[in-house]
Amino acid sequence: MNHLDRIGVILAGGKSTRFGRPKAMVQYQERYFYEASLDALQHHTDQVLIISHPTLTNQFRRNEGIRVIEDDPRYQGCGPLAGIFTAIEKESAYWYLTAPCDTPFLKKEIYDILFSYLDQEPDKKAVIPVVNGRKQPLIGLYHRSCLAPIQSLLEQQRYKVGFLFQLVDTLFVEDKAFEQLHSSFVNINRPEDLSEWT
């Protein structure tokens, strides 16, 4: 299999328990939440992969040209780390650009900034934005070499993405431009969260 330089990965394998229905399929301003992630990623790669919850797979597959797969059965229900693992295991690339399915204001410029920092430190294996002192691991860049450490964490049932950063050389990016793009990092967990933006 030939390696692509980059693959976009939309993480949509969660249960949306707090929202009460699948967040990816909620509409804001006449488009689904996940479409903001799709738009942002498609500016940086020709291939976008959706890691889907089993109940949404058929709906996502209506998108022509978008590959849709479910979490590796060994790790279904184990959170975003399982989604990143599945993407790296199933699709061959050097870099995986991740995005959640519940960030309806995500902008492509976030990835421009992350890649600009990676260009300065190309040996890093993960590039993660930090906004107001908080790491944002679901909007990031992950090198294919993260596969083995992620699998090790999953086997140990250590499901927090943050554990990965203790194992791989990670670049944490704090950039003033994130202040103007702060809405990109707003994830919608409850219906009332969305009402604040309407």
UniProtKB/Swiss-Prot annotation:
Print the domain comment field. Answer: The N-terminal domain determines nucleotide recognition and specific binding, while the C-terminal domain determines the specific binding to the target protein.
Does the keyword Signal feature in the UniProt annotation? Answer: no
Residues the entry annotates as binding Mg(2+): D102
| GO-annotated cellular components | cytoplasm
Q: Which GO terms describe its molecular function?
A: GTP binding; metal ion binding; molybdenum cofactor guanylyltransferase activity
* Binding of GTP, residues: L11, A12, G13, K23, D71, D102
* Catalytic activity as recorded in UniProt: Mo-molybdopterin + GTP + H(+) = Mo-molybdopterin guanine dinucleotide + diphosphate
Q: Which organism is it from?
A: Halalkalibacterium halodurans (strain ATCC BAA-125 / DSM 18197 / FERM 7344 / JCM 9153 / C-125)
**What is the gene name?**
mobA
- The organism's place on the tree of life at top rank: Bacteria
Q: Which cofactor does it need?
A: Mg(2+)
Main location (coarse class): cytoplasm
For this protein, the record's InterPro entries field holds: MobA-like_NTP_Trfase, Molybde_CF_guanTrfase, Nucleotide-diphossugar_trans
SUPFAM superfamilies noted in UniProt: Nucleotide-diphospho-sugar transferases
Per the record, the similarity remark reads: Belongs to the MobA family.
* Protein location: Cytoplasm
Keyword Protease (UniProt): no
What is this protein's name? Probable molybdenum cofactor guanylyltransferase
Supply one GO BP term: Mo-molybdopterin cofactor biosynthetic process
- What EC identifiers does the entry list? 2.7.7.77
Signal peptide range equals none
Function noted in UniProt:
Transfers a GMP moiety from GTP to Mo-molybdopterin (Mo-MPT) cofactor (Moco or molybdenum cofactor) to form Mo-molybdopterin guanine dinucleotide (Mo-MGD) cofactor.
Q: Which UniProt keywords apply?
A: Cytoplasm, GTP-binding, Magnesium, Metal-binding, Molybdenum cofactor biosynthesis, Nucleotide-binding, Transferase
Q: A Pfam family this protein belongs to?
A: NTP_transf_3
